[in-house]
Amino acid sequence: MLLGPLMMGLEGTRLSSEERTLLCHPRVGGVILFSRNFQSPEQLRALTDAIHALRRPPLLIAVDQEGGRVQRFREGFTRLPAPGVLAAVYDRDPAQARALSHDMGWLMASELLACGVDFSFAPVLDLGRGVSRVIGDRAFHSRPEAVVHLARGWVAGMRDAGMAAVGKHFPGHGSVAPDSHLELPRDPRARSALEGADLVPFRRLAGDRLPGMMTAHVIYQAIDPLPATFSGYWIGEVLRGELGYEGAVFSDDLGMAAAAEAGPLPRRARAAMEAGCDMVLLCNHPEAVPAVLRHLPDPDPVSDMRLVRLHGRPVVDNWRKLHRLTRWQEAVRRVRGQDPSPEGELEV
């Protein structure tokens, strides 16, 4: 059975009978988890085991676990600082900053994999230019080359733990002020301006064969009239064509306000797939899932080949064994030595 094109959210900490039925639909390919789905590492493992047991090959299980404001699982997990704390370290000592980024990526990935989560939508490849509050300290740095350097460390840490990385939000969300969860951002710059700035990390990481990319719900109005998620130009011509990207392309959540440009939820899902996405996310609208499934295409063998590469391959798949590792203990100590993360949670 191939992985379908929809990644859907769940309502609680256990699967309902209705969710079990939906997750067996051939056009479903994955689940994205949030803090509402989490109580403890033990409960999380029971949930992921139940999801993975439904199908063969198993459904993908993902989460946004970046650190700082975007860390869905907290109780029992290492509290990761926001990636932006690495900017000051990088400015003093790039090698130390990359080593810390590697630690953060490895620690995040190891803990998730030990609980049965396949991958995190990370790292953020946007520039932290002080323009976008929703990106803010989720970004590594304001300078493209620094973002590339630090992101490569983070991705290598994830890979060492057995997790595939997914960069976001292509082709760059850090230079627009509006929050795409609430409204549709519009970037007025010419393509040449993006080439020397926001596009640099995506171009470089695409060349590194990053396994996954997530698109931005942003219109780059001097370049293309559609948000990147629904744009054949951005996904087909630029990402696949110019950048030669061969990994899986994910839409950002289709329930966000910025995605309304494409119409009702079923139409949004279809438009994102027609633009070139391999999988679309519907995180917070369970009532819309049946209609969305009716509008989605059947699973595609090429997309399936891209998506199955995101299944977790944990080096350590047991929570207690992980905590006994000297490497885990030392990584926790180094990461906790960084600046404290801001309180609160950003729902993205």
UniProtKB/Swiss-Prot annotation:
Keywords: Cell cycle, Cell division, Cell shape, Cell wall biogenesis/degradation, Cytoplasm, Glycosidase, Hydrolase, Peptidoglycan synthesis. GO terms for molecular function: beta-N-acetylhexosaminidase activity. The active site is at H181 (proton donor/acceptor), D252 (nucleophile). It catalyses: Hydrolysis of terminal non-reducing N-acetyl-D-hexosamine residues in N-acetyl-beta-D-hexosaminides. GO terms for cellular component: cytoplasm. InterPro entries: Beta_hexosaminidase_bac (IPR022956), Glyco_hydro_3_N (IPR001764), Glyco_hydro_3_N_sf (IPR036962), Glycoside_hydrolase_SF (IPR017853), NagZ_Beta-hexosaminidase (IPR050226). GO terms for biological process: carbohydrate metabolic process; cell division; cell wall organization; peptidoglycan biosynthetic process; peptidoglycan turnover; regulation of cell shape. SUPFAM superfamilies: (Trans)glycosidases. HAMAP family: NagZ. Belongs to the glycosyl hydrolase 3 family. NagZ subfamily. This is Beta-hexosaminidase. The gene is nagZ.
